[in-house]
Structures are given as C-alpha cells and as structure tokens.
C-alpha cells in the first residue's frame, strides 16, 4: 500500500511538474510550486485512483484528474494559512507560502492553482469526452466554491468568531 501511494504521488508530481513547465513563466510560478510541492502523500489522488480503477478508467487519465484535485487542495491550504484566515506560519514544517513570498503573492498563487486545476481538466492531456470534462469541471467547481471548500472555510471563520465572543 505504501509503495503504491508513493508511486501515485510520484506520478502525480511528475504530471504537475510537466504541466507547470509548459506554462508561460511568471513570477507567481515559484510560489505556486512552493505551495504545490511541499511533500504530502497525495492521498486524494490515491483515493481517486482506487475508485477510478473500479470503473476501468485509464491510469494516466486518473493521474491527470488527481493532479487537478491536488491543485485545489494546495490552493485551499495556501489560503487557509493566510493571516485573515487561520494565520498559520508553518505548513508541513516549512514557512507558509505567505510567510515566504508575502501575503498578496500567496493569494495570487492560490488563485492560480485553483484555475490551473480547471486548465488541467479542460486540456488535451485529459483524453476523455468533452461531456465528461464538463461534468468534472462542474463537480470540482461545486466542491471548491461556496458549497464546498470556500463555504466550509466561511463556517470555520464564523465558528471561531462566535467562540471568541463568548470568552
């Protein structure tokens, strides 16, 4: 199991490295990479591969979809660490993205990773039907926005605010 998890993490990182390498170079790329490649087990990709294999979906297709999900996860962690959110200065034993690159750059790097997920899903790297691509994009959008990650973060912030008022 551990070897399979390491293999999936490696393949997901290789896909992401290649995808980023083909992007136009901007000053945001280092901050994006910093937030995307801090280590981590890529457990979301492993879960996706396990489920996808039941439906006989090709390994490389699942790696690409998993890479998009990892971009969303990295964006959420970068934003979660910001001073206006949880104000965490460390992530996996390293300075958070906003500590290393500044708050504004961290916000933009997170936003760029969010949109890069949709670039991956709409790209020619993902060899599935357009209908399937649209379905994936719709679902990932829902899971990332006010019905998903952003909505959850909002609830977390409101809970913390209410907790501090009670003290």
Show where each model-derived region lies.
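N-terminal amphipathic alpha-helix initiation
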Residues: 1-12, 24
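Mg2+-dependent prenyl diphosphate-binding active-site environment of isoprenoid biosynthetic enzymes
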Residues: 10, 17-167
